């Protein structure tokens, strides 16, 4: 329910933080093989941002959208890295990345429709923010799956090929 200028300002603010995180995370991710801590930080940032929108949307709106934007940008960059971590063969890595991005974009294609439908149904964005919060928390739980022990390194592939 905001006017065009303030809402556009929030969108721009979110976009700035998305770009910063998307550029920063790959550099930070090079420091170690386990990407789960960075992924957890990015998902926690989103969770705090969505909870802020749910509980105090007018008190600190720039903080909430900055956290959400940072988390979204970081997650996108890290999702590209995680798919490459699991496959060292360029063809397999490309196939996995295409699958992950394809499914991700299909899921994201539903988000605007679902948000609009929930807003039309309830008269506010609160239910959409709840859905997003639950989704991000579920993703946070799933980060445990991305253990470096499951990564396929070049040396492991060579060991299997030599047998």
Spans of features found by a protein language model:
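Structural signature of the two symmetry-related core transmembrane helices
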Residues: 37-52
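Intrinsic disorder in cytosolic terminal tails and internal cytosolic loops
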Residues: 146-163
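Paired small-residue
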Residues: 60-68
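Helix-to-loop junctions at the C-terminal end of transmembrane segments
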Residues: 21-34
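Intracellular juxtamembrane helix-capping segments at the cytosolic ends
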Residues: 74-88
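A late C-terminal transmembrane helix in Major Facilitator Superfamily
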Residues: 86-132
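Juxtamembrane helix-start elements in MFS-like secondary transporters
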Residues: 2-11, 93, 97
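Transmembrane alpha-helical segments of major facilitator superfamily
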Residues: 9-18, 100, 104, 135
């Amino acid at each position: 329910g905001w006017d065009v200028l303030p809402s556009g300002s929030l969108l721009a603010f979110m976009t700035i933080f998305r770009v910063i995180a998307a550029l920063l995370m790959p550099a930070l991710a090079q420091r170690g093989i386990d990407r789960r801590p960075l992924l957890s930080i990015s998902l926690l940032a989103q969770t705090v941002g969505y909870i802020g929108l749910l509980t105090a949307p007018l008190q600190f709106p720039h903080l909430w959208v900055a956290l959400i934007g940072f988390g979204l940008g970081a997650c996108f960059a890290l999702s590209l890295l995680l798919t490459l971590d699991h496959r060292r063969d360029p063809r397999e890595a490309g196939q996995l990345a295409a699958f992950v991005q394809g499914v991700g974009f299909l899921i994201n294609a539903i988000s605007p429709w679902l948000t609009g439908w929930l807003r039309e149904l309830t008269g506010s964005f609160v239910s959409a923010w709840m859905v997003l919060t639950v989704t991000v928390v579920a993703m946070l739980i799933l980060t445990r799956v991305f253990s470096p022990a499951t990564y396929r390194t070049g040396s492991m592939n060579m060991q299997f090929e030599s047998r």
